[in-house]
């Protein structure tokens, strides 16, 4: 899971090289910086930022569908991202399986073996693996208002009837 930080570092280095190359090629000419930076935001990484086993991918799709309920691709992806955020946080276990089956955490995880996945879950997993939701830094979420535990965490955002916390 620590590969994400490495890839971000490599991507930053590549962008700096491209910028320096552009300066060298254009010399004293004005650089098309506005278009250059706008184009960078639309570039998707060629490799996933998360390297997951087939079992981890299946578990993420199952928990995403189950916990997100009737939510769309984005809602499923937010749930998946919470699990991956926990894998990268030192306060939690390091693997998807360990995070999901950690005592008193994902209480529905015991039912995952019976859960079916959906095309929306496939799309959400692809989006998450390629860094589409890394802005979601949440470690917790809940779908019911008024739970005491959520009051001790920092609110991040709401989506599809779920509140996400850090």
Put a short name on every predicted segment.
Residues 33-166:
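Bacterial extracytoplasmic/cell-wall-associated proteins, especially those involved in peptidoglycan
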Residues 1-54, 166:
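N-terminal secretory targeting signals
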């Amino acid at each position: 899971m620590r590969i994400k930080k490495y890839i971000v570092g490599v991507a930053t280095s590549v962008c700096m090289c491209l910028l320096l190359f552009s300066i060298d090629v254009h010399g004293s000419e004005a650089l098309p910086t506005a278009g250059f930076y706008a184009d960078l935001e639309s570039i998707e990484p060629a490799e996933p930022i998360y390297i997951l086993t087939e079992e981890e991918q299946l578990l993420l799709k199952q928990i995403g569908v189950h916990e997100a309920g009737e939510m769309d691709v984005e809602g499923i992806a937010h749930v998946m991202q919470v699990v991956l955020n926990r894998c990268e946080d030192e306060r939690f276990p390091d693997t998807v399986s360990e995070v999901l089956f950690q005592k008193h955490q994902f209480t529905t995880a015991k039912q995952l073996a019976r859960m079916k996945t959906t095309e929306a879950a496939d799309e959400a997993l692809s989006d998450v693996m390629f860094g589409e939701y890394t802005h979601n830094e949440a470690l917790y979420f809940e779908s019911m208002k008024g739970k005491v535990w959520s009051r001790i965490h920092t609110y991040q955002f709401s989506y599809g009837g779920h509140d996400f916390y850090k």
